[in-house]
Amino acid sequence: MSILRAKTSGAQQHEEFRMAFKLSYITGRQDNNVLEVTLAAGQNAVVHATVKNTGTEALNLLKYGTLFDSAPVQKVDVYEGENAVPFKGILRSIQRTDLAPEVFHTLAAGETFETTFNAAEVHDLSSTNYTFIAEGTIPVAPVGSTKISDTIFFKSNTLTIPVDGAAAQSMAKAIPASIDRRTILQSGCSTTQKTQTTQALSYCAQLARAASTAASSGSATKFSEYFKTTAAATRSVVAARLSAVASQCSSLTSGSTTYYCTDIYNYCSSNVLAYTIPSTNEIVNCPLYYSALPTLSGTCHAQDRATTSLHEFTHAPATYSPGTADNGYGYSAAVALTSAKAVLNADSYALYANAIYVGC
């Protein structure tokens, strides 16, 4: 169940790891193996990342949720032993059409992009050795266009860094632990926002319930299309997560997640529909959620408010733990994931729920 709300008013420098794996086009272009990503250690939890276009053509890469993104997104996965360290930044739902030019980064042939970030800003780190790896997908459009035409899968080298916990914990977090939560939806959101959000969450609950049932006892072929396995254990996890989403979408006044209809953290930039703060279990709708999406779509794999909300609820660990990540945006990227990645990919759930509803 969810509460809907609105806002009122020095370790040693380490040797660089040069070995890297190259990124490859999922859809099998002739010019695959065109990007090379390398992680290197800085002071304490600081990571230097380089992305090099080793191909012969420029690449027009979507920034959101990648190493090109300036926001506190999940740029690397962090592990303590075999256990993933929870991410405490933001996860955003992105409009897949009518994208703005500024949400892309063009990387010329032979060009290298460099970025440096402190993993302690979005992870709680103690004094131990941590493993860092950058892995995921990047949507790509033709140069001069903003229409997504392909997806790139990437995996960097593995980097191990001994972290000074006291120094890491003194680092200011990108997202504060809590914020003032004074105004609930009914007294803060506009009438139109309240109506549209209420309708969307009602459909979200219906779609999640139907998809949960399908995951448990529906077509194995359809399930495998989105989650790349028919294993009973995986079907059970997917069904349970979707059932939990249905519960969250079923209430506007109570529960373990908090839902806002205004941009309380100021991350509603171009083409962002909504975002989730996993560490605080807060979900925020952006203006585009209301202006660019229908409440519910009857088109296969199209975006709407209901499935966007469903997508966001899977991110929140209070809905079902662990929360999902953004391992692949859109149908082509989502169905190219491994089963292990798909079961933790928010869009896989939204796309599957849409497919069960529409009959894709």
From Swiss-Prot:
Keyword Protease: yes
Glycosylation sites: N129
Active site: E312
Subcellular localization: Secreted
Binding locations of Zn(2+): H311, H315, D326
GO cellular component: extracellular region
Reactions mediated catalytically: Preferential cleavage of bonds with hydrophobic residues in P1'. Also 3-Asn-|-Gln-4 and 8-Gly-|-Ser-9 bonds in insulin B chain
A biological-process GO annotation: proteolysis
Cofactor(s) named in the record: Zn(2+)
Cystine residue pairs: C189-C261, C268-C286
Comment on bound cofactor: Binds 1 zinc ion per subunit.
GO terms assigned for molecular function: metal ion binding; metalloendopeptidase activity
UniProt keywords, alphabetically: Cleavage on pair of basic residues, Disulfide bond, Glycoprotein, Hydrolase, Metal-binding, Metalloprotease, Protease, Secreted, Signal, Zinc, Zymogen
EC number of the protein: 3.4.24.39
Enzyme class: hydrolase
TM annotation in the entry: none
Chief location category: secreted
Family per similarity comment: Belongs to the peptidase M35 family.
Protein purpose: Secreted metalloproteinase that allows assimilation of proteinaceous substrates. Shows high activities on basic nuclear substrates such as histone and protamine.
Annotated protein name in UniProt: Neutral protease 2 homolog SS1G_13741
Species of origin: Sclerotinia sclerotiorum (strain ATCC 18683 / 1980 / Ss-1)
